[in-house]
Design a protein with these regions (language model features):
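Non-catalytic terminal extensions of PLP-dependent enzymes
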Residues: 1-22, 34-71, 83-99, 105-108, ...
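Conserved PLP-enzyme active-site core in the AAT-like
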Residues: 112, 142-307, 369, 382, ...
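N-terminal export/assembly segments and adjacent metallocofactor-ligating motifs
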Residues: 103-113, 119-121, 134
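General small-molecule cofactor/ligand-binding pocket signal
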Residues: 133, 191-195, 377, 406, ...
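Conserved phosphate/anionic-ligand binding catalytic regions in large, soluble enzymes, centered on
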Residues: 269-282, 286-287, 331-335, 416, ...
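N-terminal cofactor/phosphate-binding cores enriched in small/glycine residues
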Residues: 28-30, 339, 609
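A conserved hydrophobic secondary-structure block that centers on an alpha-helix together
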Residues: 123-144, 163, 167
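TRNA-binding/sensing appendages of the translation machinery
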Residues: 25-39, 257-262, 689
Length: 947
């Protein structure tokens, strides 16, 4: 290996030979031939450009970035230029300790980012006036659609009995939000009615309504009047609110809102041509068991110390599966953390000061335009003006001066002011409009200006009064606070994270560096395409790369998570079936081992789930599949299949399985969660799939960010290409296409720069090698630990794919549960593998290609050592190393030590541990206590523990 491959892949030539020798093999090709069925192997290498060196790639991506025109955009429409404080950019966005962590399932080693997320939830609850917020969602439009479906599933018994299924959407909502709401509503049988608020009668044949606050073109709606009408007729209210406007406007809770959604992008998150950004979703506590996404809640550890955890997880899709109200299984953690630190850094006074500046500059612009005879329609507004003028002429002058407005038609346009806007910008805007409208300009000067927020809507309540938002306003203080939280969390900067089905590989610095460049991160998603040629070229190349890798003909980058990719793929199948007059087909076959998002996505796409069992080897039960496919042949829509399977096995009969589906009129959807075992060796097209999603945050090196962002593009066969998702503002597909799946045309486009770099630097050979070494590493771990743990499933030749499942259920006879092993691994400095998925009481281990032999051996040594510790445990005595794990520094430095093992055995169980000891900040967290006493904001926590 040479070039970037040798940096990305952890195993060197000598280590490779040693590992192969341990497995009794003479080559990696020998291993692959025993692992992947020959009938699905690729016959030639991927047709991709040669691999770039790291410096070569950075030169290339910089050159490409210069094709983007970095104009100042006053377009608004849910996206505004923001200012990322340098202390946050350097210490979080560019810090692998933050961006390489995983979703905080292991609470004891995730207290830092969960505190940041608790701060985020507090900001959202304070600004919206609601009781409960989640830890972020994918984008504002997705949040709005989730609100509609949550309230639909929460209708009263009378409404369900009367089939009340209409949902009203104000026509001054964001266009992308209306489109996404319509996408989600149709397969669920929800009738969306779009109209003017002042013409809507709020009749009780509607179960809910949606309002924008302020509206799309800036006017502040009379939520008080409309809220009263809605409540008097039993309608639930969803409000999409601007986060900065809420600093000056009354909270939506004052007007009876049941759900408040929006985006926190304005709190220091770059535009990124559409994302990733953290959306918010706030609601009443009565919906706590229905709210989508993650919630961080306060609990306590076994010593009664305050401890954070993900609350109410039993409501989520991985538990409820096809009964879940949402398929959301990720937050936008990295972006939510950044937004929370923005709130901590600026504090309530600083945030209000920024909001006032935005409003005052908007008023100044309004007054200046009126002076030169330009008509502005909004009487009340926060940051956006609706203006009359010759738009074509004004657009020409604006683009000559490198600024963008939102052009509505040939007589109207709007301008949205943002945090980065200066007095000079206001003068330039006035000059541009004056020239385009053939008027004489005026000199703008900022003096005292009258607020354009109605008196009845001026915010009276304070916000962010908790101590944390009032003490870290210097850079030194915030830097230390960030570092304090960082030290509480285990990430890839500390050790291997072997989470099965999660692919925690290297996120190389050279892939990450460009996302900090303004030429990539400061582009508005709705600029004219000629201003984003760098992005357009990158997107086109990345789509072609993914087509080549999957064997398919078309790709959409729009889905901004794996679960959204699943939904998008199924909606594409649905649209295709409708186009051939087969819309009655609605049965989706799903193996029992599938990830919980699969059945949840199928239900959201209007399909009925029929579960297929697995045999004792972990394969799909082919006989049952045939019987159920034939039973439902008139209505069969799709099979959802993960390949290799979630059991870590390449099923040799996969082509026969997909043929059964096609023979019975269905389409095959392949879940791409395990694509890291396919790239360069086989592909979804060869196995017989029609569509798949990919997890760019797994296989293609986008970091997990502590629980997001994710990107879940879909790749489709030729007959499905016309149905790929579209966008109402920028047309990216055909007339037959599915409507919006995400808010932005290309989803989280900024993150795609990372995957583009990954593919460009590895090239065809490097990608293939990455897959081979991922499989080698998994099989080496299997070889090392199989004498100590039962390996549940393996292929016909005794090989694992890129992951393996160990059975921990026999240890119950020693009083040990799988979670005890997970917590004990913390004492050894490791994050646990995936626990109890896809089989309860097991662990699924996936090492990826990025780890070296020393680290893999340390992990194996830890697992073997723990297995020996299990033998010394008994049901009768829970006072043991595993049941007491993890052990904190506070615990072992205490004078009192009432344990039947030494302090050294507790925290330094093997020699390597002391060289790089990771100390958890809390002991075992009490999950049940946290759910019984739900606390999801950062009010002084000591008072809660006392009570």
């Amino acid at each position: 290996m040479k070039g970037f491959s040798s940096r990305h892949i952890g195993i060197n030539k000598e280590q490779k030979n040693y590992m192969l020798d341990s497995l009794g093999l003479d080559s990696i090709e020998h291993l692959i031939s025993e692992t992947i069925p020959n009938n699905i192997r690729l016959k030639k290498d991927l047709n991709l450009e040669g691999a770039f060196g790291e410096n070569e790639f950075l030169t290339h991506i910089e050159k490409l970035s210069k094709k983007n025109k970095n104009y100042k955009s006053f377009i608004g429409l849910g996206y505004n230029q923001s200012v990322t404080p340098s202390v946050i950019k350097r210490n979080i966005l560019e810090n692998p300790s933050w961006y390489t962590a995983y979703t905080p399932y292991q609470a004891e080693i995730a207290q830092g980012r969960m505190e940041a997320l608790l701060n985020y939830q507090t900001i959202i609850c304070d600004l919206t006036g609601m009781e409960l917020s989640n830890a972020s969602l994918l984008d504002e439009s997705t949040s709005a659609a989730e609100a509609m479906t949550m309230l639909y599933s929460s209708r009263s018994r009378e409404q369900k009995k009367g089939n009340v299924s209409k949902f009203f959407v104000s026509n001054d909502a964001l266009k992308q939000t209306i489109s996404l709401i319509e996408t989600r509503a149709e397969p669920l049988g929800i009738e969306v009615v779009v109209g003017k608020l002042d013409e809507f009668d709020f009749s009780n044949d509607f179960y809910g309504c949606f309002m924008q606050y302020p509206g799309i073109h800036g006017s502040i709606n009379d939520l008080n009047k409309y809220g009263e009408k809605a409540k008097s007729n039993g309608l639930k209210i969803v409000v999409a609110a601007d986060i900065f406007a809420l600093c000056l406007l009354k909270e939506p809770s004052n007007f009876g809102a049941d759900v408040v959604v929006g985006t926190s992008q304005r709190f220091g998150i770059p535009l990124g041509y559409g994302g990733p950004h953290a959306a918010f979703f706030a609601t009443k506590e009565e919906y706590k068991r229905s709210i989508p996404g993650r919630i961080i809640g306060l609990s306590k550890d076994v010593d009664d110390n305050p401890a954070l955890r993900m609350a109410l997880q039993t409501r989520e899709q991985h538990i409820k599966r096809d009964r879940a109200t949402s398929n959301i299984c990720t937050s936008q953690v990295l972006l939510a953390v950044m937004a929370s630190m923005y709130g901590v850094f600026h504090g309530p006074d600083g945030i209000k000061r920024i909001a006032l500046k935005i409003h005052e500059l908007t008023v100044l612009l309004d007054n200046s335009l009126r002076k030169i005879g330009i008509k502005q329609f909004n009487k009340n507004y926060f940051d956006t003006l609706l203006i009359e003028g010759p738009t074509e002429k004004i657009k020409l002058v604006a683009e000559e001066n490198k600024i963008n407005f939102n052009y509505i038609d040939n007589k109207h346009f709007s301008i949205s002011i943002n945090e980065a806007t200066s007095l000079n910008d206001i003068q330039l805007i006035v000059d541009v409009i004056a020239k385009g409208a053939e008027k004489d300009s005026v000199i703008t000067s900022q003096g005292t200006s009258e607020s354009k927020i109605p008196k009845d809507y001026v915010r009276e309540s304070k916000f962010l009064q908790t101590k944390i938002f009032n003490i870290h306003h210097s850079e030194t203080s915030l830097m230390r606070y960030i570092k304090n939280l960082e030290r509480k969390d285990l990430s890839l900067t500390h050790s291997m994270i072997s989470l099965g089905s999660c692919t925690m590989k290297l996120n190389a610095a050279s892939e990450m560096i460009p996302i900090s460049w303004s030429k990539w991160n400061n582009i508005h998603p709705f600029v004219p395409l000629n201003q984003a040629q760098g992005y357009q070229m990158l997107i086109d190349r990345l789509e072609k790369q993914l087509n080549e890798i999957t064997g398919f003909s078309g790709t959409s980058l729009q889905p901004n998570s794996g679960a959204q990719g699943e939904y998008a793929g199924l909606m594409v199948i649905r649209a295709y079936l409708k186009s051939i007059s087969q819309e009655h087909r609605n049965i989706c076959l799903i193996p029992s081992s599938a990830h919980g998002t699969n059945p949840a996505s199928a239900v959201m796409a209007g399909m009925k789930v029929v579960v297929i069992g697995t045999d004792k080897y972990g394969n799909i039960n082919e006989q049952e599949l045939k019987e159920k496919a034939e039973l439902h042949r008139e209505n069969l829509a799709a099979l959802m299949v993960t390949y290799p399977s979630t059991h870590g096995v390449f099923e040799s009969s996969i082509q026969e399985i997909t043929k059964v589906i096609h023979d019975n009129g269905g389409q095959v959807y392949m879940d791409g969660a395990n694509m890291n075992a396919q790239v360069g060796l086989t592909n979804p097209h060869i196995i017989g799939a029609d569509v798949c999603h990919l997890n760019l945050h797994k296989t293609f090196a986008i970091p997990h960010g502590g629980g997001g962002p994710g990107v879940g593009p879909i790749c489709v066969a030729k007959h499905l290409v016309p149905f790929l998702p579209n966008n109402p503002i920028i047309n990216v597909s055909s007339k037959e296409s599915v409507k919006s799946i995400s808010a932005a045309p290309w989803g989280s486009a900024l993150a795609c720069v990372i995957s583009y770099g990954y593919i460009c630097m590895l090239g065809a050979k490097g990608l293939k090698s990455s897959t081979e070494y991922a499989i080698l590493n998994a099989n080496y771990i299997k070889h090392r630990i199989e004498k100590h743990y039962d390996i549940l499933y393996q292929g016909e030749n005794g090989r694992a794919a890129h992951e393996l499942i160990i059975d921990c259920r026999p240890f119950k006879q020693n009083g040990i549960e799988v979670m005890d092993i997970a917590k004990r691994l913390i004492d050894y400095g490791f994050h646990a593998p995936t626990v109890s998925f896809p089989v309860p009481g097991t662990m699924m281990i996936e090492p990826t290609e990025s780890e070296n032999l020393d680290e893999i051996d340390r992990f194996c040594d830890a697992m073997i050592s723990i297995r020996l510790e299990v033998d010394n445990c008994s049901k009768e005595n829970k006072n043991n190393l595993l049941c007491n794990a993890p052990h904190t520094i506070k615990m072992i430095s205490s004078e009192k030590w009432d344990y039947p093992y030494t302090r050294n055995e507790a925290v330094f169980p093997l020699p390597f541990v002391s060289e790089n000891k990771f100390w958890p900040s809390v002991r075992r967290v009490d999950d049940a206590f946290g759910d019984r006493n739900l606390i999801c904001t950062c009010s002084p926590i000591e008072s809660y523990i006392e009570s």
